[in-house]
Amino acid sequence: MLIGLTGTPGTGKTSVSKLLEKRRGWKVVYLNDLIKEEHLYSEVDEERDSVIADMELIRERLSGILEEEKGQHAEKAKVNGEEKENITIIESHLAHYITDIVIVLRAYPPELKKRLEKRGYSEEKINENAEAESIDLILAEAFEWCKKVFEVNTTGRTAEETLGDVEKIIDYILAGKENELQEYIPGSLDWIDSVP
């Protein structure tokens, strides 16, 4: 099963993904790293200090990675006699363009700004990301691209606390109990007035 963990930069995707990888042993594809390492982009945006991802190249490369992972999982299951679901997490602010199931991590824009300042982001990039968060940009895109969308508020919470919510969502999906995830249905967070 392929699950996206997405959100504006600074919402906790990487921290939670590392914990998922360690605690659950699930495969995590850190998509932004893969894009840079394997040059899966069409151009470099010097002004914004970023690259323009080539989604076609990314999908092709991910297909290969997922086939490889599927084979490794099947081999491991054969040896260990396991019948566990093969879970792969795609971690990126672009994950919702790849997966049908996505968990969108959110953070109150003023807190998001503080997190990005600690990372040394430029003021322009901080404001751009805080504004994107305040208008629900990634959440809106997730609705457009994905079949199942869940939302987790990371404001004032540690990565471990957020991990508990993400694990619960995935475990309930695996158990067929999605209807019991009402607290993660998107739309309860409204931060439109939080950024001038």
Curated annotation (Swiss-Prot):
**Which residue intervals make up region (NMP)?**
30-53
Taxonomy, superkingdom:
Archaea
Pfam families for the chain: AAA_18
Query: Which reactions appear under catalytic activity for this entry?
Result: AMP + ATP = 2 ADP; ATP + H2O = ADP + phosphate + H(+)
What are the recorded Gene Ontology BP terms?
ribosomal small subunit biogenesis; rRNA processing
Q: Entry's InterPro entries?
A: Adenyl_kinase_AK6, P-loop_NTPase
- Which principal EC class is assigned to this enzyme? transferase
LID as annotated region, ranges: 118-128
A molecular-function term among this protein's GO annotations: ATP hydrolysis activity
Residues at which ATP binds: G10, G12, K13, T14, S15, R119
Q: E.C. number, please? A: 2.7.4.3
- Answer yes or no on keyword rRNA processing: yes
From the UniProt record, list the coiled-coil ranges. Answer: none
- According to its UniProt record, which protein family does this protein belong to? Belongs to the adenylate kinase family. AK6 subfamily.
Purpose: Broad-specificity nucleoside monophosphate (NMP) kinase that catalyzes the reversible transfer of the terminal phosphate group between nucleoside triphosphates and monophosphates. Also has ATPase activity. Involved in the late maturation steps of the 30S ribosomal particles, specifically 16S rRNA maturation. While NMP activity is not required for ribosome maturation, ATPase activity is. Associates transiently with small ribosomal subunit protein uS11. ATP hydrolysis breaks the interaction with uS11.
Concerning PANTHER family, the annotation shows: ADENYLATE KINASE ISOENZYME 6, POS9-ACTIVATING FACTOR FAP7-RELATED
Q: What is this protein called?
A: Putative adenylate kinase
Protein's organism: Methanosarcina mazei (strain ATCC BAA-159 / DSM 3647 / Goe1 / Go1 / JCM 11833 / OCM 88)
Lineage from the top down?
Answer: Archaea, Methanobacteriati, Methanobacteriota, Stenosarchaea group, Methanomicrobia
